[in-house]
């Protein structure tokens, strides 16, 4: 089972890419902390203090302003996540996230739905941060 979905933000790819790879910026909308920014070949620990959770990601590939690929085990099973950015209409960027792969059974379906919810939260929180300077995790204006 795989999940793949897209959304558009009215900003250029470079600005969105920076908000995703920079751990200080990412902690203003998605995670509560990390020990590093996203860099190809690096192992990074992401933390969600409000969920009392942390997860190590293994960054496989980074293409400036275009692509981030990493492996993690957020559902207890290793999966690969690919975040791709491409210019859309003038001044907009299409973001596509694909995560794979879970077993093709009921539990795999549950994991996929759980991650789809998480990535939907990511999209919404990224937009709120970049467009309105709001952290949806805390409800605070930054």
Each PLM stretch: what is its role?
Residues 49-92, 100-103:
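Hydrophobic-ligand binding "helix-grip"
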Residues 4-10, 45-47, 58, 84:
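Generic structural detector for well-ordered beta-strands
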Residues 1-35:
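Hydrophobic ligand-binding cavity/cleft-lining segments
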Residues 16-20, 26, 44, 59, ...:
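Hydrophobic pocket/interface hotspot
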Residues 11, 21, 54, 114-117, ...:
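Generic recognition of short, well-ordered alpha-helical interface segments
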Residues 1-10, 89-96, 136-137:
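Aromatic-glycine hotspot motif
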Residues 101-142:
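A conserved amphipathic terminal alpha-helix motif
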Residues 33-42, 55-57:
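A solvent-exposed, acidic/Ser-Thr-rich amphipathic alpha-helical stretch
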């Amino acid at each position: 089972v795989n999940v793949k979905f897209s959304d558009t933000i009215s900003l250029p790819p470079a600005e969105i890419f920076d908000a995703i790879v920079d751990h200080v910026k990412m902690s203003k909308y998605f995670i509560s902390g990390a020990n590093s920014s996203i860099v190809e070949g690096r192992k990074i620990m992401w933390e969600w203090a409000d969920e009392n959770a942390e997860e190590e990601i293994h960054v496989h590939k980074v293409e400036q302003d275009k692509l981030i690929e990493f492996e993690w085990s957020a559902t207890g099973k290793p999966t690969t996540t690919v975040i791709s950015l491409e210019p859309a209409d003038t001044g907009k960027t299409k973001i596509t996230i694909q995560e794979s792969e879970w077993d093709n059974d009921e539990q795999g379906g549950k994991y996929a739905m759980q991650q789809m919810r998480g990535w939907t939260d990511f999209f919404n929180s990224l937009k709120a941060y970049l467009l309105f300077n709001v952290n949806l995790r805390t409800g605070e204006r930054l």
